[in-house]
From Swiss-Prot:
Post-translational note: Methylated by PrmC. Methylation increases the termination efficiency of RF1.
Compartments reported by the entry: Cytoplasm
GO molecular function, a single term: translation release factor activity, codon specific
PANTHER family linked: LD18447P
Protein name per Swiss-Prot or TrEMBL: Peptide chain release factor 1
SMART domains xref list: PCRF
Keywords attached to this entry: Cytoplasm, Methylation, Protein biosynthesis
GO cellular component, one term: cytoplasm
Residues carrying N5-methylglutamine: 240
The family this protein is said to belong to: Belongs to the prokaryotic/mitochondrial release factor family.
InterPro entries tied to this protein: PCRF, Pep_chain_release_fac_I, Pep_chain_release_fac_I_sf, Prokaryotic/Mito_RF, RF-1
Taxonomic superkingdom: Bacteria
HAMAP family reported for this sequence: Rel_fac_1
Length: 362
């Protein structure tokens, strides 16, 4: 029977069961791309279905207890207890029904670029790279370095990563659900290894993140005529050759000017496929940003330049202090954060975002 108070939950339950039926069909089960898309939606609806099932259970038990209360005093006590539980179950369901970012369950492409500060900025970009790789390791995610330019001192001029979860995670456990808040300028304050007089220097690195598109994502179509593809020899740290074939690919999307370099894979064909997937991810992110702008509901803005004034977070080494300027989160465990203990910082952004979404629903 339909629930007049929560019709959206009933619709979600119906879709949830419909998806389960589709996933059981042999032709769907043998199609990994189709299964991934259905699995992602199934996981997204799962939170609603779980909250709705719990709410219905409390509500039905309460109605039954009230009917039996006139015959058995014990049921009157049970009804009183359930009356106390019902508001919390309702609130949990209302929260679950608040629309999530549809990309939360997606994997993520991340770019880290050294900004103002010369060699020190490149060294800090390397610190951020290690921090995110350690964080991904703690979360059980895989990290693929798709392209990287380093300095002689071991710093990072720029690096591109693909960070992916195992299987099909629930939206709240997706890579994008956590890492989407990392986009912006990260500022560091410390005494550089190149500083002979021991003065504290401020420099910065920029982080750009966007959800990774599926290989068969039909939301973005790219005309081959709009692509300019250059082939070159892969190179490693210090300009060393990775292999002796021209397998690296530079793919340019002519209408937007977006350029993707890919040399991580072993063959030119693999690098072309990987570059095309990253390009689709960037175009998908651009499309979603435009849609959000039109709806006056922009996502957390990311770095548009590497100016220190656009900082989202400051890493102060002398004080072992980290500050997130969007949420006013502050802690004195910078060493642990740079070793991948980033969850508390990210949680502060998630909680602020959820509070905003709740406020917009009221």
């Amino acid at each position: 029977m339909a629930d007049e108070q929560f019709p959206a939950a009933v619709t979600a339950l119906e879709e949830y069961h419909n998806i389960e039926q589709q996933m059981a069909e042999p032709e769907v089960a043998s199609n990994p791309d189709k299964m991934r898309k259905l699995g992602r939606r199934h996981a997204e609806l799962g939170a609603i279905v779980s909250a709705y099932t719990a709410y219905k259970q409390v509500k039905d038990d309460l109605e039954a207890a009230r009917e039996m209360a006139s015959e058995d005093p014990d049921f009157a006590e049970e009804a009183k207890r359930l009356e106390g539980e019902l508001p919390a179950a309702e609130e949990k369901l209302r929260t679950a029904l608040i629309p999530r970012d549809p990309d939360d369950a997606r994997d993520t492409i991340m770019e880290i670029k050294a900004g103002t500060g010369g060699e020190e900025a490149a060294l800090f970009a390397g610190d951020l790279l290690r921090m995110y790789m350690r964080y991904a390791e703690k979360r059980g995610w895989s990290v693929t370095v798709q392209s990287e330019n380093t300095t002689e001192l071991g710093g990072v001029k720029d690096v591109q990563l693909a960070i992916r979860a195992k299987g099909t995670p629930a939206p709240e456990d997706g890579v994008w659900a956590s890492l989407k808040y990392e986009g912006g300028v990260h500022r560091v304050q410390r005494i550089p290894v190149t500083e002979s007089q021991g003065r504290i220097q401020t420099s910065a690195a920029g982080v750009i993140v966007f959800p990774e598109a599926d290989e068969d994502d039909d939301e973005i179509e790219i005309d081959p005529k709009d692509l300019k593809i250059d082939i070159f020899m892969s190179s490693g740290p210090g300009g060393q050759s990775v292999n002796t074939t021209y397998s690296a690919v530079r793919m340019t999307h002519i209408p937007t000017g977006i350029t993707v370099n890919m040399q991580d894979e072993k063959s030119q064909i693999q690098n072309r496929a990987a570059a095309l997937r990253v390009l689709k991810s960037r175009l998908l992110a651009m499309k979603h940003e435009q849609e959000a702008a039109e709806a006056a509901d922009m996502r957390h803005s990311q770095v548009r330049s590497l100016d220190r004034s656009e900082r989202i977070r400051t890493y102060n080494f002398p004080e072992n202090r980290i500050v997130d300027h969007r949420t006013n989160y502050k802690a004195y465990n910078l060493d642990a954060v740079l070793d991948g203990d980033l969850q508390a910082v990210i949680d502060s952004d998630i909680q602020a975002d959820e509070a905003d979404r709740l406020a917009n629903q009221k």
